[in-house]
């Protein structure tokens, strides 16, 4: 999911 990539970036 796109959300996983967002939190993974942080």
From Swiss-Prot:
It comes from the Eukaryota. One of its GO terms (biological process) is neuropeptide signaling pathway. It is found in: Secreted. The modification Arginine amide is found at residue 10. Its main location: secreted. Disulfide bonds: none annotated. Expressed in the antennal lobe (at protein level). One of its GO terms (cellular component) is extracellular region. This is Tachykinin-related peptide 4.
């Amino acid at each position: 999911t796109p959300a996983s990539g967002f939190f993974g970036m942080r």
